[in-house]
Swiss-Prot record:
Protein name per UniProt: FMN reductase (NADH) RutF
Record keyword Flavoprotein present: yes
EC number: 1.5.1.42
Matching InterPro entries: Flavin_Rdtase-like_dom, NADH-dep_flavin_reductase, RutF, Split_barrel_FMN-bd
Protein family per UniProt: Belongs to the non-flavoprotein flavin reductase family. RutF subfamily.
Species this chain originates from: Methylorubrum populi (strain ATCC BAA-705 / NCIMB 13946 / BJ001)
Disulfide bridge positions per record: none
KW Disulfide bond (keyword) present: no
Region (Disordered): 168-202
Gene that this sequence comes from: rutF
Compositionally biased intervals (Low complexity): 168-191
Top enzyme class: oxidoreductase
């Protein structure tokens, strides 16, 4: 066994892993659901695209989260990607605030699934959960996108180094800022209406 193999066999400390992950800048989303299991939602950064044929998103949720049981029972969700003015609602959905108070902080509409879609989100992806896998403390959800609603141009909300930050949008018809790191503005320390495009079900 080589030295490198020996070192790689040592488990990574969970706190060291969390510290390393805190250095990544991620988009911020509200994951919402409604249905037989009740209305619920939480703030998430563990969201990514899987495929565009068919359109599919991946969403991760801790099984200890208060939104977990309603989300799984409903089988549907809406991924609401937040803009720079949404740090307050992101903080509410990311803490221990009661569900009714979380939803009172925003204005909502319904798309295809019935899950609440934030009217001024940068974009909302209305989804149906098609696969679920348990990995460690979380469930990994594969979600078929059935409708998309975009609110237009706005700054993006990011989460990096345990702070919310804004990423200014690129000028219309132009390129992104030459130094996006300097353009990003820290706006908080807590872990934030347009046409609807219907997609065919997967």
């Amino acid at each position: 066994m080589t030295v490198s193999e020996t070192e790689s066999a040592v488990p990574v400390d969970a706190s060291a892993y969390r510290e390393a992950m805190s250095r990544l800048a991620s988009a911020v989303h509200l994951i919402t659901t409604d249905g037989p299991g009740g209305r619920a939602g939480f703030t998430a950064s563990a969201v990514c695209s899987v495929s565009d044929a068919p359109p599919t998103l991946l969403v991760c949720i801790n099984r200890a989260a208060s939104a977990y049981a309603p989300l799984i029972r409903n089988g549907t969700l809406c991924v609401n990607t937040l803009g720079g003015g949404h740090e307050t609602v992101a903080g509410l959905f990311g803490g221990r605030t009661p569900m009714d108070e979380r939803f009172a902080a925003g204005t909502w509409r319904r798309l295809r699934s019935g899950a609440p879609a934030l009217t001024d989100a940068l974009v909302s992806f209305d989804c149906r959960i098609v696969e679920r896998h348990a990995v460690g403390s979380h469930d990994v959800l594969y979600c078929a996108v059935e409708a998309v609603a975009a609110a237009g141009q706005a700054d993006a909300l990011l989460y990096s180094e345990r702070r919310y930050r804004t990423l200014p949008r690129a000028p219309r018809g132009g390129s992104a800022p030459a130094e996006p790191a300097r353009g990003a503005r820290a706006i908080g320390a807590r872990p934030p209406e347009g046409p609807v495009l219907a997609l065919r079900s997967a």
